[in-house]
Amino acid sequence: LDNRLTYEDMLKICETINIHYIPDEQLFYDTIDHILENPENESASEIILETFTALLKLIDSQIKEIETKVNIQPSCFKGCAYCCYFPIITTRLEAKLILQYIQSLPEEQKQDIFEHLLNYFESNKEQLEKVCSIDFHEDPQFKFKYISEQVSCPFLDRSSNTCKVYEVRPTPCRTYLNYCHPNVCAQSLMPRETFSYEFLHEFYMTALNEVLQEFLYEDEDLGITFPDDVFHIDYLPKLLKEEL
């Protein structure tokens, strides 16, 4: 007997989460206050990167806390990459911070990721031009059209179906989870059973924005254009290619 959650179960759980378990935004402010008061790094760019990674970890911990409260566990597992073909829309700021994170990695790992990205953009050039031209503002079918082309995320290692920047993967990736049978993702390009904690994104971006403003007038070149990079959103592959 398979007692996995159904779509109907998820509708009820979703309602419960929305009514009772939306986290307090103050948690995100407390995190940035702690970093600003006790920074592990000295330079402004390093503190911003430290904040970026800390806020992403906070998103993960908040999701786990909600899961505990409503007694659910994701059926996602390492090596399952169906959602890694979804359109990831993010800010230019986040794309820049992901690249800064890669730059901070050990030399061998850093070179491996950059070589992977260059190969990715070269081998998927025509498909990327096609999918990144889909208007996600105006076209209600943009997600389906994008997924139908089966262009993987720039950071997906297709040999292992794992993420090369898992620790700093964008919020659409880390907030999208399946709690029903794992087959639902295999059987549909856009399964209705999946759940997104996208409400956490606003808390995270607001807190990150607050930290940026702390360092706007520092002498150090942060490589960030404020506020443009915060508000400019586009497909992740397009932003990464422009910033490489």
Show where each model-derived region lies:
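Short loop/turn segments that flank or connect secondary-structure elements
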Residues: L1-L244
